[in-house]
Amino acid sequence: MPHLRGDALAALSRSAYRGRLMPEVTKDQVADTLEEIAMMLELKGENPFKIRAYRNATRGIETFAGNLRQSAEAGTLGDIEGIGEAIAQKIATLVTTGTLESHTNLKAEFPPGIFDMFDISGMGPKKIHAVWKELSITDIAELEKGCRDGRVAGMKGFGEKTAANILKGIEDRKKHAGRFRMGEIAADAERMLDDLRSHPEVLRVAACGSYRRRRETCGDLDFLVSTREPKIVSKDFIAHEFVESVIAHGDTKSSVRWLSGIQADLRVVKDAEFPFAMNYFTGSKEHNIVMRQRALARGWTLNEYRLGPVDAPKTKPEPVPEIREEADLYRALGLDYIEPELRENMGEFKAAEEHTLPKLIEVENLRGTFHNHTTLSDGRSTLREMADAAIELGLQYLGIADHSKSSVQAHGLDEKALLAQVKEIRALNKELGPDFRIFAGSEVDIHKDGSLDFDDEILAQLDYVVTSVHSVFNLGEAEMTERIIKAIGNRHVTMLGHLTGRLLLQREPYAVDHAAVIEAAAATGTIIELNANPRRLDMDWRWWPLAKSKGVKCAINPDAHHTSQIQFLKFGVGTARKGWLTRDDVVNTQPLGKIEAVLAAKTQRGKKA
């Protein structure tokens, strides 16, 4: 089944694997279950009115501000907008028992492989139903065969172009097989780190590899511990509740498969070896090569266990300094300490030699954030809930940017609804007081020709504007680039959202000339978003050094559709650090008293021009 809400469903699945129910079924889990039922009914070709009833119920649950269990016990679930008596009874069963038999039975009617087809870009319920019923295709392998032998192209409503796009989606899925997004693994990785830290026999612990370097996806997880009792620690690692199966087990290395599907490795070393192992297993490979070369230049040999003199009769190595911490190793090699996120051999050694490494941004530097959605479009939390969550996180401001009218699939707001929301925001700001502010904005669609979804008269009434591409992804690079540059040329556009439209491990970025867009952003004073949603992390970290050199500012935005997703900011900070960004490069490190001027700067410049 597709991950409709990623982390929430993944957490639910892990709990089920462990053979215990969630202590309380959440609103998101109920909404996910109802949406799954709607999708399965659509797969079966059921009555559209029945499907719509479940979709309406999903929407009703998403916007419901009360307690579902209390409503179930009081018999008032039917009072929620969009929920009829029959579905109310199903919801009551789900929230009180943790299971819904009709959902389980319905899922059992389908071949297991059919749900994997949802992972293919462009394959929705209608197309999956068509290939299933007309061609008896029940999994991705059969779908690929059907595309290659012409059967899929020959179906009504498909054609050669659709078949080619499906094949591309299948190839993309193969390419990404075995990779995991940060949002899928971070919670479990941090939990494992906490559990290892609390182990009585563990002296030091670290996560290494691409996770520590904050790459956008990971193939596996690498944990490192130092201990005097390797047998005990290794045995406890493979017995952890996350473990589905043991791949290999030994005193110095153990590999397991977690219930989430990712492989996790534990390496066990002596405490004196820890800084060397930590550096080596963090990588990257290219970074490690340079580290070893620098050691050899001093007459030393460096590996994952030690730094020592080269064993050669004619060499006169420098005295080997004592290394207790990873920073000591860099110092010994004539370098300032290089943060893990920068270890890609992309300029960090030169900067470390010249003492010009940046002081990278920290999560604690953020004072607020923009590009957040509410239940007025496709969000699952109300305006007030989003504001309360931001306040609880210690933020000073929150920018709301619900979808604009062309995003019909996301319940985009028209002019009337948008201005009503602005009025609501102004009123809520008065209620919340002077120490916190909600900024009224909109995520405005960029049309194919580069025009915007709202005219300037509407945009001028907003505090800020995010503009994004949400349709027609298949343009050539030149046309897509021209489209985006035209859009950000509007003086009311404050920031450009998710530059490439990519969905990590799911949808490839559309073709766009990053350098040209960055130049245009610099020329117009447009902020570029670093979309912190772990499915996006867009603009990619590789382009931020160029943007920074051109004076383009970054806004780290969570693209939150729920209160819990505001915390996606931490993933954005990881990517920003990987892009060499400091607090001065990111606009939402500015306090409330200064951010208004930042948001208004482009518009004011446009007035003077």
Which role fits each region the language model picked out?
Residues 21-46:
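Charged, compositionally biased N-terminal leader segments and the immediate start
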